């Protein structure tokens, strides 16, 4: 079982992804949900997290700002974004994968 967190500033995106994961990915346990990078840092500091579903474009710090903290761990990142121009940057940041919003269930299962 993988312990995962969802990080996204949009309530609808967070709840939609949570629902998709709960209904379709029985090997993933959602250990927390954050609406900002600072909340994600707090979750990472207090939980053993295997996987992060991380939005890129958020107010304040963006998803890429969290990467330096994650790189020193074995935590994998799947970026979620509505902007396909971030795909190359996500790959260069050693993301496990990236998903374009709205998230397609088949793409989620492949990631």
What label would you give each PLM region?
Residues 41-111:
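CheY-like receiver
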Residues 31-40:
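Conserved Asp/Asn-Gly motif in the active-site loop of CheY-like receiver
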Residues 7-8, 34, 52:
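Conserved sequence signature across two-component system core domains
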Residues 17, 34, 87-90:
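Generic structural signal for conserved hydrophobic packing positions in ordered secondary structure
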Residues 10-32:
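Two-component/phosphorelay signaling modules centered on CheY-like receiver
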Residues 1-4:
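Extreme N-terminal starter segment of soluble prokaryotic enzymes
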């Amino acid at each position: 079982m993988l312990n995962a967190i969802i990080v996204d500033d949009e309530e609808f995106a967070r709840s939609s992804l949570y629902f998709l994961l709960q209904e379709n990915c029985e090997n993933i346990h959602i250990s927390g949900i954050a609406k900002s990078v600072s909340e994600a840092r707090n979750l990472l500091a207090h939980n053993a997290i295997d996987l992060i579903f991380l939005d890129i474009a958020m107010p304040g710090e963006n998803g890429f700002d969290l990467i330096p903290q994650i790189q020193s761990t074995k935590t994998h990142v799947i970026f979620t974004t509505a902007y396909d121009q971030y795909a190359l940057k996500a790959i260069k940041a050693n993301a496990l994968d990236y998903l374009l919003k709205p998230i397609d269930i088949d793409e989620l299962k492949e990631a």
